[in-house]
Amino acid sequence: MSKRFWLTLPVILVLAASVTACGGGKGGKSGITLTVGSKDNTENHLIGEMYALILEDAGFKVKRQLSLGGTAPTFEALKKGDLDLYPEYTGTGLTVMLEQKEPEKDPQKALEKVREGFKQWNLEWLDPASENATYGFAMKKETAEKYGIKTFTDLALHSKELVLAYPQEFDVREDGLPGLQKIFKDKGGFQFKKQFQIDYSLRYKPLENNEADVTVSVGTDGQIAGMGLVQLQDDVGFFPVYNVAPLIRKEKLDAAPEIKDKLNALAPLLTDSAVQALNWQVDGPDKKEIEEVAKQFLIDHKLIKG
């Protein structure tokens, strides 16, 4: 073996040690790989991508399984361990997974209930955002002003003069039209001049095409801000709160507790108006890529490096 090799060997060993120490950054100091999922709608996909980007920036190796489907397949994947975390809503946790009959209107109580209830699956809820992705009703500004409609009560009083568009099952679910009709049976009854069903993803088209006066909405829909619509106030507290939060397997959080602070830093930034604007960048005329929108938002708020 040559003298030159022996002189070079210490340098190689030092470099190898350095690479090993630094290269482990992609797997975090603990070497943990995290699989991040999401449901198959714009908002949930956006927030899931943000979780993934934040964790990657913190040094974790991240696998993405985004836009898996609806609540059922995504939650099952989490329970089975195919996912480690995904964005879920407190209202969904209560009414779907925990099967609570009465909707919870208080955000803090909703959080306390899901945190306690999800212990049976060894799952933990981190800090929820203030954004409330709950159901409601949206109208064009000129229509709302014409009839003086600002609240659900106002809508009930004028319902017989208006046309409603709604997504599948809204006319048969107790937390939809039937429940509202019971509440307002002496105030217009929530009985519309005409009502028709439309695919969930197309629910704003009838307003655009002047085929309906009112549509069922979600509080963080990008179309509300993008189209300049009026979101009616739920003055009777009919719909439960739906605050989004990271839902994560306890074993992963125990192994890397720093995950909590990293993801919790996002919560205060996800307000109704912020999420509406994010959704509109994807669903509006610009049709930006979800990955681009999520990354730029995090860079702008200094949650990840540019």
Where are these regions (language model features)?
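Bacterial signal peptide processing site
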Residues: G23-K26
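An extracytoplasmic/periplasmic, membrane-proximal ligand-sensing/linker region
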Residues: E43, D175, Q181-D186, E258-G306
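Beta->alpha turn/N-cap motifs
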Residues: G70-T71, G81-L94, A110, K140, ...
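Ligand-binding "clamshell"
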Residues: M97-D106, L111-L126, E211, Q223-V236
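A bilobed periplasmic-binding-protein/Venus flytrap-type ligand-binding module shared by bacterial periplasmic
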Residues: Y135-E145, N243-A256
